[in-house]
């Protein structure tokens, strides 16, 4: 379990490195933006974005809001978005994009606490996935439900 590809991004801050990672989900190459601290990773925050397509896309500034010097922060783009293969699927295949990413992170950083933050669409994604994952906490932020 690992990333297929890691591409360094041209974003410079003193405490973290930014990479666009690619990982395999359902035989598709799915991408995410990840900021990894230069120091030991003690905590992981998985930011599940809202919106569809380019609306609500994952941005470095949003990830930076959740970081400290020992926190890895990652936001999956979801299939069909920002160079990820496949078709954007609300609450179907995109759930697998989240679960596989968390499984990879847990295998790479087994001692780190994993926290999920889901906004809008990501809020419901988190509700549908967090109970089956090695996650220590979950925050739903304005999730839509019926």
Model regions and ranges:
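N-terminal cap/lid segment of alpha/beta-hydrolase-fold proteins
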Residues: 2-38
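Short beta-strand element of the alpha/beta-hydrolase
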Residues: 42-51
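Short amphipathic alpha-helix adjacent to the substrate-entry channel of hydrolases
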Residues: 57-75
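Glycine-rich "HGGG/HGxG" loop immediately N-terminal to the catalytic nucleophile
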Residues: 80-91
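Alpha/beta-hydrolase active-site loop
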Residues: 89-108
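Alpha/beta-hydrolase fold nucleophile elbow
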Residues: 109-120
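Glycine-rich nucleophile elbow surrounding the catalytic serine of serine-hydrolase chemistry
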Residues: 118-128
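Hydrolase active-site cap/lid region
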Residues: 128-146
